[in-house]
Amino acid sequence: MKYFFIIASFVLCEISLQAQLFQDAGAISTSMAGLNTNNNNVWSVNNNIGQLSKLEYTTISISSFQPFLIKDFSTSNIVVGMPVNEGAFGFNYSNSGNKHLQMHNLGIGYSKKMGSNFHSGMKINYSIINAGDFYNKRSVWNADLGMSAALSKELELGVIIKNATLSKIADYNNERLTTNFQIGASYHFSKDLIVQTGLEKNINYPASFLAAINYKPNEKIIINGGIASNPSLAAFGISLIQKKFTLSFATQIHQYLGWSPDISIIYQFK
């Protein structure tokens, strides 16, 4: 029965082909219900490219995400971020699927510090979709945009646009990749406690309200949690910091489809 609901949801929502190309990446993102506008780490390569220019060291990370505990939906990611002068370059590769539907995504992005309080960036993605006899093999280019602005020491705003190019998959029925917008604000109550809120809008679906919290009880542990309204889900996770390594565990709980675990390992070349 669980498999039936999962398959039906993917078909009815038309996300089996579109959404995974824009899957939020990294366990930190997963633990905050996909609220990514004001998170700054190496996973900004995939999430908010505008935040990548805040990266202090060359960093590499890998992750494995399994939606609804279904092996065939598993997504593996690798990202690299390299600071340069007043900006940073980022690279990513991800793959997901099984023998019937495979997706590969390769991306390169650049983020730059535009003054003391504003950061912006752009990322170019090349995606390959192999869906066997139905779609055959297709490839498509698209671009993501991201930016953030510090309004004060405590308050920050961020914006993400995924597939700003409205890239087309096929001429038939004007089939295009979906475009996603996210705008959010974060407030630093202290150096150890950050609360975030935001709105996410896919051009094909109703808007979703997002909220998340980031708490650092000590120098080696970070605890995250988040909620989203559409679809209705809750998320939580924990990160363990050990010198140059950060190990993150997270999961999301969908109202109907269940658990989606994620694990990430980050290494900084300090």
Each PLM stretch: what is its role?
Residues 1-20:
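Bacterial Sec-dependent N-terminal signal peptides
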Residues 20-270:
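Subset of outer-membrane beta-barrel
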